[in-house]
């Protein structure tokens, strides 16, 4: 059995495989591999529910930091960490970023995108909720999403100013004062 390997350059990971690229008509075991960074893996994961709905057995590769999240979110898929994968485990392969080409061919197809496709750890949520309540304090939560990619990062990052309306309650003096400290 051949074992596929990945290029070491994180910005340009490539799969060395003898297996053909997955096509929508294929009825095969599909290996979806991650060729980009963590943020892209999360973004393109929105396509996984549609891919699973096609009925193909799925081997989904992810960054180790996403493994537990993906196991909860996509229980029908077999989840594997980045690294070498035996070709005997799949018939076709596709980089996760290429799924958009197949599943989002036009603007209307974005309406099919599922909301809430990632499933939080409910036990951890309850644990955190109990801890926050036990402190008796109010907590401020910060949000940051930025990309370090010099080519596409600026168009895929959110400056705090764009989030103000969603984050600040106009009638809440505390949120107003917290925001003033950072803007």
What annotation goes with each model-predicted range?
Residues 1-183:
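Catalytic machinery of carbohydrate-active enzymes
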């Amino acid at each position: 059995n051949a074992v596929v390997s990945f290029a070491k350059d994180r910005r340009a990971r490539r799969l060395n495989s003898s297996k053909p690229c997955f096509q929508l008509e294929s009825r095969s075991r599909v290996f979806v591999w991650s060729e980009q960074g963590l943020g892209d893996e999360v973004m393109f994961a929105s396509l996984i529910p549609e891919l699973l709905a096609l009925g193909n057995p799925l081997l989904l590769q992810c960054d180790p930091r996403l493994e537990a999240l993906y196991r909860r979110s996509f229980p029908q898929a077999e989840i594997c960490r980045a690294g070498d994968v035996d070709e005997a485990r799949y018939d076709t392969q596709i980089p996760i970023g290429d799924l958009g080409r197949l599943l989002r061919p036009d603007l209307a197809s974005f309406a099919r995108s599922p909301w809430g496709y990632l499933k939080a750890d409910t036990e951890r949520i309850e644990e955190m909720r109990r801890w926050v309540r036990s402190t008796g304090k109010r907590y401020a939560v910060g949000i940051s999403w930025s990309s370090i990619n010099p080519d596409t990062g600026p168009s895929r990052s959110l400056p705090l100013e764009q989030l103000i309306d969603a984050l600040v309650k106009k009638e809440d003096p505390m949120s107003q004062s917290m925001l003033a400290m950072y803007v």
